Regions:
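Short, low-complexity disordered leader/linker segments with a strong preference
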Residues: 1-45
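Exported/periplasmic ABC-transporter solute-binding proteins
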Residues: 29-127, 132-312
Length: 312
């Protein structure tokens, strides 16, 4: 596992990467949340895990699979978005926060202020933030600049014809922009890396979950949206993406994430308060084992290469 110390600063969506979602920390192991409070003979240790919707499906599978390995441990997984998970961690309400973005410097400071503990981050895998259109949309590739023109406040593209796309059988080619809510790490990553931290245009369809974004795009001929690459369905098309006009366009894939050619590749994180120990450490070690990484691989995300994984 690649550990990132802070400076100032199921199988339904399975596919290839995902790494962050069900882990916790016993109160006696230096973490917050509810872990270990169930204790006692015959009772399970409960690990509370909350955060990134991108990772929630893989986290649920991890929890199920780990329950077969460690039947005395129960991992309770919930989504809500990276920001929601981190906020819960900062209050000591959960043991593990999942995030598809880096923790912000102010969040690190808030954790220390609230709990007296420094957050510990773990990169547990990689994802490509894919751009989706309806399967019948003739568009096959797009540039980051074109995406900004579509999604950013002040961007000039409001109709498909303005970027040279004509959708057969569509009279009104107004672009339906499908986005995420502001508590989402996916939203923040897209805003930073595509919009250059500009505001989004008003009038987009802002949804709670990654799956919901893809479902809406798959049911709307004129829609475009963004979500983790593991959420693709036959109803949508993943666009190739180029960093700028004239540059090569790359499909979001394991290969393009691994060789860093895809412009919107990102790391996925687990965050704990303080160093993970005891049952939590064992759970993280299991996630980074062949068994845990197989779940990641089957989830549509990019697992940590075997040579880069720590030995338990």
């Amino acid at each position: 596992m690649t550990r990132v110390p802070f400076s100032p600063l199921h199988r339904q969506a399975l596919g290839w990467l995902v790494l962050s979602s069900a882990v916790a920390v016993l109160a006696s192991c230096g973490g917050g949340g509810q872990a270990g409070r169930a204790g006692g003979q015959g009772k399970k240790t409960v690990i509370q895990n909350k955060g990134s919707d991108t990772m929630v499906n893989v986290a649920q599978v991890w929890a199920e699979e780990y329950g077969l390995v460690a039947p005395d441990v129960e991992v309770e997984v919930s989504g809500g978005g990276s920001g929601v998970g981190i906020a819960a961690l900062l209050k000591g309400a959960v043991d593990i926060a999942n995030a598809s973005r880096d923790m912000k410097p102010e969040e690190v400071r808030q954790a220390a202020k609230n709990t007296g503990k420094a957050p510990q981050g773990f990169i547990v895998g990689y994802d490509a933030l894919a751009v989706y259109v309806h399967q019948d949309n003739p568009l096959n590739e797009v540039t980051v600049e074109q995406l900004a023109q579509i999604f950013a406040e002040g961007g000039s593209a409001t109709r498909w014809s303005q970027i040279g796309v004509r959708i057969p059988g569509v009279a009104d080619d107004t672009i339906v922009r499908v986005s995420r809510q502001s508590s989402s790490g996916t939203y923040e990553f897209f805003r930073e890396h595509v919009l250059g931290n500009q505001d989004f245009k008003q009038g987009s369809r802002d949804l709670n979950g990654s799956k919901e974004v893809v479902e809406l795009v798959g049911g709307t001929l004129t829609a475009i949206g963004y979500s983790g690459m593991g959420y693709a369905t036959p109803a949508v098309k993943k666009l190739k993406l180029s960093a700028k006009a004239g540059a090569p366009a790359y499909e979001p894939s394991v290969e393009s994430v691994t060789n860093k050619t895809y412009p919107l590749a990102r790391s996925l994180h687990l965050y704990t308060l303080g160093e993970a120990q005891g049952p939590v450490r064992k759970y993280i070690d299991w996630i980074m084992s062949d068994a845990g990484q197989t779940v990641v691989q089957e989830a549509g995300y990019v697992p940590i290469p075997a040579g880069q994984r720590p030995k338990p």
